[in-house]
A protein has these predicted regions:
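C-terminal non-catalytic regions of proteins with extracellular/luminal or membrane-system context
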Residues: 1-438
Length: 438
């Protein structure tokens, strides 16, 4: 791609005629103007010799050999196959949820047969959301059209013949399997839906799990090539009241003019709370002619580094070293830099009945309390030398190599009270907690 305007084109697939250009249900609107792909080719590209075959049934997931035979015959006489495949309206619409991510089997069967002919196969895929793409290796090119609106056929032709250069990027991750998605363990549920991802939504989940994906968040190709270089920060050390200016250069190293979406992520956040590996904090689109370089600029502030702290009722940026990452997708990071953040606010420390003995030992007022409780509880002491001997002695089968002192330091205050035989009451626990929070 792109193809010449004089190509012999075999357009195959019912979705080339009955185009899914919008959603169903309450989202359905009447278009002001709409043409299918065959009409666009006939009216706007008179030199293109186009044929059409339905190829598969849309209402039923059955292989129709008559449809298939016509499609294969047309494809054999063509220079390029334009195969329109995707989710029929009956498989994906308002009012019900999908139970799988598969495309209809009859469409995949036809793709395999078309690929066996040895002709270039360009797939235009129509879906409202990600689907499994284990069949994608059979296609020479794949355009994820989603439901692209009433002008989708015009856009398809412009992309096919090079009047437009693709520059879109995926706004979601396409997984390799339904079982890889975070909702797969709890969906479907009756009456309730539990969103268990927390802050690990979308690409954040797949990154944290270090899980391979079919196509990552932010992915998208072009007919030209792009080089990222010269990442620079205006400061190496900032406070959470400052802004940070990030710049980098983007060069079109290919042979066609085009647009590139540059993505900026912030990663390696300090681990005071569970955080994603990285998060998108900005993106911009630039146009470059072949050989041209453009400088792109991003401005980051406190929110770019922060998480919402429930106790503070505000966004909080922890002190520490963060990574600034520039890339073409969430899995294609081209440039990296680091910046040191200094928080100007101190998180108010609060304690409850689950405060551990180890935490109490870090407080001057708590050390005497802990020592008194440990003495009263009379935990047996095991020296480090003895503990190591028992851990490594294969003949010692007695399970006594536990470091009781370490176990005691991890014990919550309320559990010490439970195990004290009445020596420490719940009232005593409340008194200690109240004193800690003064």
């Amino acid at each position: 791609l792109p193809r010449a305007h004089t190509a012999r084109v075999a357009v195959i697939g019912g979705l080339a005629k009955t185009m899914r250009y919008q959603g169903g249900g309450s989202s359905h609107v009447n278009p002001t103007f709409h043409r299918d792909l065959l009409t666009v080719l006939a009216e706007d590209y008179p030199d293109v010799k186009a044929t059409f075959a339905r190829g598969y049934r849309l209402k039923k997931d059955e292989v129709d050999e008559d449809f298939v035979s016509r499609a294969l015959a047309n494809a054999a006489e063509s220079d390029v196959v334009i195969y329109c495949m995707g989710m029929p309206n009956g498989w994906e619409s308002e009012g019900f949820d999908r139970t799988h991510l598969r495309l209809p089997g009859n469409q995949i069967d036809l793709l395999n047969r078309l690929a066996a002919l040895g002709k270039p196969v360009v797939v235009f895929l129509f879906t409202g959301a990600p689907v499994l793409t284990d069949w994608a290796a059979k296609a020479d090119a794949l355009f994820a059209m989603y439901t692209a609106g009433q002008g989708v056929a015009e856009a398809m032709a412009r992309l096919l013949f090079g009047r437009a250069n693709p520059c879109g990027k995926l706004a979601e991750t396409w997984p390799l399997a339904l079982e890889h998605t975070p909702c797969s363990l709890t969906y479907p549920q009756k009456e309730t839906a539990v969103y268990e991802e927390g802050v690990f939504v979308g690409y954040r989940y797949y990154d944290k799990k270090q899980m391979p994906v079919a196509y990552p968040f932010g992915f998208g190709l072009s007919y030209t090539d792009w080089q990222y270089s010269n990442l620079r920060l205006d400061k190496q050390h900032i406070r959470d009241t400052d802004t940070l200016t990030v710049q980098l250069d983007v060069t079109n190293t290919g042979r066609l003019p085009g647009k590139e979406i540059v993505e900026l992520y912030v990663g390696n956040a300090p681990a005071g709370v569970p955080r994603p590996v990285k998060e998108l904090r900005g993106f911009t689109k630039v146009f470059c002619t072949p050989g041209q370089t453009q400088t792109v600029t991003f401005t980051l502030n406190k929110r770019s580094f922060a998480y919402y702290h429930v106790g503070m009722h505000d966004w909080y940026a922890e002190s520490g070293t963060y990574e600034i990452l520039a890339g073409a997708s969430s899995r294609d990071i081209r440039l990296r830099a680091t910046v040191r953040m200094e928080a100007t606010r101190v998180i108010p420390k609060t304690y409850d009945r689950f405060v551990t003995m180890g935490e109490l030992m870090t407080l001057p007022a708590g050390q005497a309390v802990v020592q008194e409780m440990m003495a009263a509880y009379q935990m047996p002491a095991v020296s480090e030398e003895e503990r190591q001997r028992r851990l490594n002695d294969e003949e010692d089968t007695e399970d006594v190599a536990m470091d009781y002192a370490a176990m005691g330091m991890d014990m919550p205050l309320c559990k010490v009270a439970d195990m004290s035989g009445g020596a420490m009451t719940e009232e005593t626990v409340r008194t200690i907690v109240a004193a800690l929070n003064q």
